[in-house]
């Protein structure tokens, strides 16, 4: 086992990043399809497609919250487990895995109960109109029953990737996505279930992915295994995981809060078509964010392991390469969106009016996308080295300090209030990336100097 896991500290960084990031990026790209394939099919339901798409879009904030809770323990626990592996403390690494697993189950039970009891009320508060509430409620009610699958799949898959098994993590997503793509048209169109069919397809697909994850983590191929004796929550091990995971949780949960604010403002100033366009914009933004996060997740085991092993040279080298790759991707996608916005809109709907509206605002909404490579590289590296405070600062700054106030401030200052709501995103992005880069330049250097002094 010792010989197997040390490849994170010995193989060339460029080769390692390709080995770990490519499967993770593929998984994120497929996961992106997993997340948006429902919307593509729903948007093409005869006669009611546009309203149904808008209704499912209102569910997005709640779905983001469910996903965020999966990150609450795992996004902190997985890097901590990698750091323990770098220190050759496999016992603490496995206890971290077991404690996070148990905590994830408890969170799932609570979330399922909340969604079933108060889901409809939440949808109305989150921007559903009388025209879209029935579609939203139908989708969410069925989706709620798959909460356990979502939590364990997203949460525990992070521990698979953290051990360096990027391909296994990729298969987790491929299995679910393939099942979802096959089941969606059957349930939505062939069986005439509409949005309920889309939700059922998602739940069943997540169940398959969950089974795959648990079989691997209980098997002999994993370095870190789920063992009965480790399924207890040790505050000493879990609290640092939760503190570190709080940054990722804040980032994802804030997406939900921001989505609610966007939907409410857009419904007020632009009506259902503006909310429908926002559903498409959010999906397009996933084309940017998920692959970037995949690259960052591929780099995470390398950074965390070598940080734990006090190999600062490889930590620096990994960050430089991560930043370069992330920037190339974000700039390339930004150019495509700015040049061909209508192409992205047509993927989701055949409605000519919605396509025209979306194409116009997409250029505005994604204007700051080219800078995302810097944001993600710095953010993911903070998490990888266990810098909980800096991670939380970066997460809170962009969404709560900048974007949230701008959603309400800009419409009060500009004549075209609907456009002003969309403009809040790029303005916040530019300011946030600037602040993040400055913070990272000082804190990353300080963390490595401290590590070298204690070596």
Where are these regions (language model features)?
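Interfacial/gating helices of multi-pass transporter permease domains
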Residues: 42-64, 131-135, 195-196, 237-244, ...
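Short alpha-helical transmembrane segments in multi-pass integral membrane proteins
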Residues: 1-24, 81-148, 190-245, 303-368, ...
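Alpha-helical transmembrane segments of multipass membrane proteins
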Residues: 36-40, 113, 121, 155-159, ...
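N-terminal transmembrane alpha-helices
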Residues: 8-48, 61-76, 80, 84, ...
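Helix-terminus/linker motif at the lipid-water interface of multi-pass membrane proteins
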Residues: 29, 33-53, 123-130, 186-193, ...
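Small-residue-rich hydrophobic transmembrane alpha-helices
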Residues: 53-113, 150-169, 277-335, 339-341, ...
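Short runs within selected transmembrane alpha-helices of multi-pass transporters and secretion channels
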Residues: 74, 143-161, 169-177, 198-213, ...
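Transmembrane helical elements of multi-pass membrane transporters/channels
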Residues: 19-38, 142, 176, 205-209, ...
